[in-house]
């Protein structure tokens, strides 16, 4: 009886865990580079990157609050430090008052060399209204001579209600070996 109960309990937990998120693989030129787990309720799509149509960008929105996220490969860079220059340039292009809120620091994500940074600024929305965003950026060396970027931009409310999912999103980035 106990074994049957434990089996049902374990099966139920597995069903809940598998329904709670979806792992997505990022590939470039048909070569898988890394995976990232999208939390339950986050809507996402894969499309050509507007700044580099030869690569794709997986992006979307969270289910609660104003939260946008994206992952892609930074064009023509081989290190996180080179990619960081790209972040600074791109941030100033999209968000004219962009500023760092926390000094960038080096670390790792699941065995990959990484650089973390946090920013804030005002961005025009599609409806023309201005919106203040906080952005978290993780640059990571995929081990294939490419650097991936994961970005999450959110308003204050989005940061509060999606905090755990945002943290899980960044921690889930893994190389494909």
Residue ranges and their predicted role:
Residues 1-7:
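Bacterial N-terminal signal peptides that target proteins for export
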Residues 88-141:
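Signature of long, low-cysteine stretches enriched in small and polar/charged residues
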Residues 35-85:
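Secretory pathway targeting signatures of secreted, lumenal, and periplasmic proteins
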Residues 7-16:
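Bacterial N-terminal signal peptides
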Residues 34, 38, 82-90, 162-169:
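Stable alpha-helical elements in mature extracytoplasmic
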Residues 74-76, 90, 152-158:
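Short, solvent-exposed aromatic-acidic interface loops
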Residues 20-22:
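Boundary of Sec targeting at the N-terminus
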Residues 42, 145-177:
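Surface-exposed amphipathic alpha-helical segments
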